[in-house]
Amino acid sequence: MCNFNIKRQINKLYTLTTVSYFRIAGASWVALLALRGFSLLQIGILESIFHIASSCFEIPSGVVADVFGRKRTLALSKLVSVLSCQAMILSDNFGTVAFAIAFSAISYNLESGTIEALAYDSLKSVKQEEKYNQYASTEMMLYRITSSTATFCAGVALWLGYKKAYAIDIFFGIIALGIACSLREISGFIGADGEPTNPQTDDHKQKQMSEEKQ
């Protein structure tokens, strides 16, 4: 860790949060599906599929982070997100949309808590874990600003159409993937209870609830 630049790592995590949550199609997916002719019943079923897939993969996604590391898990999350958007562009019926929605849920699960855990481990590696609350506060602010901006762009997404809107999400997803791959992996930090560190702050829980509503 002698050449580890904690400031650069934290700034990359801030940038990753900002880029990751600017998803104009993801923020307006219900309206986009309605625009494509899907009924309210079908949209409700698709949202149920999202939550079911999210519940089924919640524990396995945590195992992935513990076994393969936070950095690889974040990168995989961004890759799955890009594939989900691509699947949505190519979808032409209820079944293919459901497949894309399930992939989106897996992406959310892989990312959920992983950025926070990597930030905490990074700060702990340089004995600055007391700065984690400051990081979490700033990260939550960036998340809210970015996700709100994406929501405000819902009209733009509807004007562009679902294919172009998801293409924009893919563009930002690829940037996020590049940032995730450039992060420094931190390993070997175990919490006081003998478990790998994985901070679950109130801010993170609020963010997770907001994500599942999108």
Across the structure, where does each feature detected by a protein language model lie?
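Transmembrane alpha-helix termini and helix-breaking/packing motifs in multi-pass membrane transporters
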Residues: 35, 88-90, 147-168, 172
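Juxtamembrane intracellular "pre-TM" segments in multi-pass secondary transporters
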Residues: 1-10, 183-214
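C-terminal ends and interior cores of transmembrane alpha-helices
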Residues: 79-93, 97-98, 181
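Cytoplasmic helix-loop-helix junction between adjacent transmembrane helices
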Residues: 102-143
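Helix-loop boundary and gating motifs at the non-cytosolic
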Residues: 2-56, 89, 214
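Hydrophobic core of transmembrane alpha-helices in multi-pass small-molecule transporters
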Residues: 18, 84, 95-111
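Residue-level signature of mid-helix packing/kink "hotspots" within the transmembrane helices
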Residues: 51-59, 144-148
